[in-house]
Amino acid sequence: MANSITADEIREQFSQAMSAMYQQEVPQYGTLLELVADVNLAVLENNPQLHEKMVNADELARLNVERHGAIRVGTAQELATLRRMFAIMGMYPVSYYDLSQAGVPVHSTAFRPIDDASLARNPFRVFTSLLRLELIENEILRQKAAEILRQRDIFTPRCRQLLEEYEQQGGFNETQAQEFVQEALETFRWHQLATVDEETYRALHNEHRLIADVVCFPGCHINHLTPRTLDIDRVQSMMPECGIEPKILIEGPPRREVPILLRQTSFKALEETVLFAGQKQGTHTARFGEIEQRGVALTPKGRQLYDDLLRNAGTGQDNLTHQMHLQETFRTFPDSEFLMRQQGLAWFRYRLTPSGEAHRQAIHPGDDPQPLIERGWVVAQPITYEDFLPVSAAGIFQSNLGNETQTRSHGNASREAFEQALGCPVLDEFQLYQEAEERSKRRCGLL
């Protein structure tokens, strides 16, 4: 259609609008944004090499706009409609996460951009969980929850209309895009008015806090929004000075020279006033603030090594002990880009330098990149991990629901049922990283 606005532009508008809304709803999130911005600035000022590296890898521009949100929905129809909504923003479902392994009755995917240019512009992601009613053991309660969910519509009538218009037209003009962002935002807004009476809320809450959070409100409010930092240990140590109480442990791998995957911490969930049906006042605890530090994406081989080491490490009682123990355990995981490349543990994006461009005819498909890197013809840049760690996600959920030590089981994965609810298969994160690396090699003439 004429004058259509791009998915990247719509995603950018939406992520900015969501951040502004969440700042109003949860003022501590605004404090967190300021703290993260200060820490990132200090890290880049003290490390010119990192600054230059991030500029060259097109990573710097995205740093300050980078966010991920998390939401929870109750029905297959809600999930499928969200898939249509996020597609308009150029966000697609990547990976399947089974959080039942940590006693959380949901399974999830991450809606995110998948091509290089979109990720470089704004890598906004939304970790989206679907409640698994079949994991509610009490049959009467299970039926009641299903009935409550059947009666709500988390999308405004105009939002549904705009979804239809987009799919018929194949795009939005600027006016439609702006209206869509505002209507879509309503789905994620916090509502003080619960849709149930206090007795129903308590019954669902006693089954699992998260069930009450999903079932008892009119929308799928954001339960956290997460900025990206370059030094999560520093943010964690400074949070109390800003009047923010952090969770006990930083989730994920230890601090390293070459960060891998994802490290996360958060502050405790807020206790918020709610009004139950019948105007009875009460409180609900669900929404919190989170911070993340992202590293390089690992290959299946690297991920297997990570999972094995993490399993052996266990968890400590306090963050300092836990981090020291993790660093000791992870000594066997190579901590240099060269070794990780040589051992096939991580994904890299290859680029020709000006000197490499001048010698392009001397580079052939199948050449080993290492001699070309040493010659200064090629640079290898770590590909940022854009996804999530199921155990960390579950750990964040648990700690913010007031339980840091929930036992972890083998879970009860049901990817097929999730994809059926979603209306399409989820994309494979490993395949996306492999394709990104191969695209870069092809551009250099290495493939």
Swiss-Prot record:
Keywords: Dioxygenase, Iron, Metal-binding, Oxidoreductase. It catalyses: 2-oxoadipate + O2 = (R)-2-hydroxyglutarate + CO2. Fe(2+) binds at H68, H224, E290. The keyword Nucleotide-binding does not apply. SMART domains: DUF1338. 2-oxoadipate binds at H68, R72, H224, V391. The keyword Oxidoreductase applies. Its cofactor is Fe(2+). It comes from the Bacteria. Catalyzes the decarboxylation and hydroxylation of 2-oxoadipate (2OA) to form D-2-hydroxyglutarate (D-2-HGA). This is 2-oxoadipate dioxygenase/decarboxylase. It comes from Shigella flexneri.
